[in-house]
């Protein structure tokens, strides 16, 4: 039997509130993180991802107390990201109740950190977040580049090559966000999702751009993603997690219903 695909609602947290922006700016309030997480746990989400979206930009660690509160209320895997720069940061988050940590900016500035983290804590709890933006012109061979600091800083790194390198260093999972699609509701960037899913042996989580349930199906069927991450469509009540799971199952995708 194929492994069930996962639906992961994402809590982008800024100043203690769940928010949602378009292309990482233009913020809209979506509620209290603990309450939002509880709702998704009750609805049957497979996992929850908590991203402290100001952590890397403003240079501060993720809110440990909030992670503890969420972990105390949800009984599904919790991934925490934002400002994770050292093994001490990882230990702090795992002790607070996170099951996995997501490393983004620090993976670029210090790739060996990914190796060190995987050696110390195990690949199964190390997620590398890849924020990719298309840099090729229309008609050219598609090419995507890695951006850091919440999508503000270009790195010159090729996204597909970078994904391979991160897996070689020990990443157990990749959280791939299309910066071009984030918040647009235009659907995942299937091109980069498929390119990275085909290039690596670990699960790829597709993120950025979900506007309807067909986009979730496409992420798995066309993009080759193992999991799909979304925020707005769930936060603002357009769809519930059970709606999404049923729809994906009806389209022939193995789901935990």
From Swiss-Prot:
Pfam families: His_biosynth. GO terms for molecular function: imidazoleglycerol-phosphate synthase activity; lyase activity. Pathway: Amino-acid biosynthesis; L-histidine biosynthesis; L-histidine from 5-phospho-alpha-D-ribose 1-diphosphate: step 5/9. GO terms for cellular component: cytoplasm. The keyword Amino-acid biosynthesis applies. Coiled coil: none annotated. InterPro entries: Aldolase_TIM, His_biosynth, HisF, IGPS_HisA/HisF, RibuloseP-bd_barrel. SUPFAM superfamilies: Ribulose-phoshate binding barrel. It comes from the Bacteria. Keywords: Amino-acid biosynthesis, Cytoplasm, Histidine biosynthesis, Lyase. Its EC number is 4.3.2.10. NCBIfam families: hisF. Belongs to the HisA/HisF family. IGPS catalyzes the conversion of PRFAR and glutamine to IGP, AICAR and glutamate. The HisF subunit catalyzes the cyclization activity that produces IGP and AICAR from PRFAR using the ammonia provided by the HisH subunit. This is Imidazole glycerol phosphate synthase subunit HisF. The lineage of its organism: Bacteria, Pseudomonadati, Pseudomonadota, Gammaproteobacteria, Oceanospirillales.
